[in-house]
Design a protein with these regions (language model features):
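Residue position within the beta-strands of beta-propeller blades
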Residues: 2-4
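Short loop/turn positions at the edges of beta-strands in beta-sheet-rich folds
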Residues: 8, 51-53, 175
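Structural motif
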Residues: 9-16
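Short glycine-rich, flexible loops that bind phosphorylated cofactors or substrates
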Residues: 10, 85-86, 190, 246
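Glycine-centered loop/turn positions within well-structured domains
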Residues: 12, 55-57, 245, 276
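Cap/lid segment of the alpha/beta-hydrolase catalytic domain
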Residues: 21-23, 30-162, 167, 193-203
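Conserved beta-strand termini and adjacent loop/short-helix elements that scaffold enzyme active sites
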Residues: 27-30, 271
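Active-site-proximal cap/loop segments of hydrolase catalytic domains
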Residues: 108-315
């Protein structure tokens, strides 16, 4: 039996077990442990808490580089939700260990609706895109800050993609907890996503079972961030691939337009030619640099990197 495996601190490695029950042994000539021996990797720890509803929500955290319990550090919160769990991987599109290396604490949560915790837990996403999941995340962040006094509670950022991008936008309509936010390929209007893109209808066939824009305004309007845009106060970065076949670009564009009309801090970055998942190396690096620069601007009060990538200009 052979498989690839990795952890939050160990890169991908091929493992082989000679028979069921046998201890797996690393295979191959590449020693990733040696490759990373001069790289500072943040300590990864489990985190869980009980919500006001009595549910146990799990996740994990990464300590920032240079961690000192007597100092203050900004925090970045990552989540997905919406029927997919967050993984504990070193190799990841959103390089959480790199963020830790830049001096951020990192908190990763698996809120209600995530698979892997039983059918009842997963089914909480059905016809309930917004509030319950958002409540889990907000409660989790507050509890994590209460338990970890090294966090600067005025410098907390959040980010997510796809449904996680929707959740970023929705969170900002519910709380002022965050000082900066990133929505990648996020959904702003559940009604317009319902019939758009390759997966809009098929995804909602399960996620909004027997609910449609004409018979469930509580879901399609009251849980869509676009219809609550005036509540958003947090600086928001919207990123979207121009060739996204899952979530059409208008989902970011209409939120950008709304927030611009409202005079809010919002930036929209298009990734030319990129699909829902950005696979081309140079474009992935563009996305990552944009993420790092955005958080540096708002959570570390240093706009140098951002201004180097995106020159200030008057329109």
């Amino acid at each position: 039996i052979a498989w690839f495996g990795q952890t939050g601190t160990q890169s991908r490695l091929l493992y082989v077990a000679s028979k069921p029950g046998a201890k797996a042994q690393p295979a191959g000539e590449v020693d990733f442990g040696k490759t990373l021996e001069n790289v500072a990797v943040g300590e990864v720890s489990d985190f869980s808490f009980q919500t006001q509803r009595g549910d146990t929500i799990t996740g994990y955290s990464i300590l920032p580089y240079g961690y000192d319990p007597n100092k203050k550090f900004p925090l970045v919160v990552y989540y997905y939700g919406g029927c997919t769990p967050t993984s504990r991987l070193l190799e990841f599109f959103y390089p959480l260990q790199v963020l830790a290396g830049q001096g951020y604490g990192v908190l990763v949560l698996n809120p209600s609706g995530t698979i892997g915790f039983g059918q009842e837990f997963a089914s909480r996403h059905v016809r309930a895109w917004g509030k319950r999941t958002a409540d889990d995340i907000i409660e989790g962040v507050r509890e994590f800050c209460r338990e970890n006094t090294w966090i600067d509670s005025t410098k907390i950022g959040c980010m997510g993609a796809s449904y996680g991008g929707f959740m970023t936008q929705y969170l900002l309509t519910q709380t002022d907890l965050f000082a900066a936010a990133i929505s990648h390929a996020g959904i702003s209007n559940i009604a317009s996503y319902w019939g758009g893109g390759y997966l809009g209808y098929s995804y909602n066939e399960a996620a909004a079972m027997n609910s449609y824009p004409w018979n469930d305004p509580e879901l399609y309007v009251e849980q869509s961030p676009l219809f609550m845009a005036e509540r958003i106060k947090t600086p928001l970065l919207l990123m979207h691939g121009t060739a996204d076949t899952n979530v059409p670009t208008n989902e970011s564009q209409q939120m950008f337009t709304a927030l611009k009309i409202l005079g809010k801090d919002v930036t929209y970055i298009q990734i030319n030619g990129a699909n829902h998942v950005v696979t081309e190396f140079n474009k992935r690096e563009q996305c990552r640099a944009t993420i790092f620069a955005w958080f540096a601007k708002w959570l570390q009060d240093d706009a140098t990197w951002w201004n180097a990538i995106y020159k200030p200009k008057n329109l």
